[in-house]
């Protein structure tokens, strides 16, 4: 009788451990290293006089000081997998009014891409995740670049 009860209990415990590991916070600092090159595009969606427009700024030439500040900021933020992350294709519908695209290169090879939205969604290498304080993250990144 005890063996019959032990097997389902072990399965439930193993499932709970897998859930904890799967949903644990992941660090944004894993997407870039000091020897990588970075490029960014910041976009803000607005409506003026009834017409929608997108204001975009490209940040192509990132200085060493800016890169160090960016790496430090990336170390402070985390993101989490969702149930849908496993099956996501990198698309997201809830963008908010601000987005930041970060492209990380090793020489000329794109190794990581991050698309953060002010709504709390972040797409990393074509997988969608949730990120707390995403809007603050975007604003701090823009402060570093300006």
Q: Where does each model-flagged region fall?
A:
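Function-determining sites in protein domains
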Residues: 4-146
């Amino acid at each position: 009788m005890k063996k019959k009860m032990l097997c389902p209990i072990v399965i439930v415990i193993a499932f709970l451990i897998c859930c904890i590991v799967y949903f644990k916070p992941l660090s944004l600092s894993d997407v870039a290293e000091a020897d990588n090159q970075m490029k960014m595009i910041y976009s803000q969606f607005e409506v003026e006089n009834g017409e929608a427009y997108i204001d975009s700024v490209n940040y192509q030439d990132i200085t060493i000081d800016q890169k160090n500040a960016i790496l430090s900021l990336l170390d402070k933020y985390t993101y989490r997998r969702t149930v849908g992350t496993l099956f996501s294709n990198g698309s997201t519908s809830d963008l908010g009014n601000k987005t930041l695209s970060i492209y990380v290169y090793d020489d000329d090879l794109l190794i990581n891409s991050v698309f953060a939205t002010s709504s709390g969604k972040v797409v990393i290498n074509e997988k969608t995740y949730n990120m707390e304080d995403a809007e603050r993250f975007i604003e701090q990144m823009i402060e570093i670049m300006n």
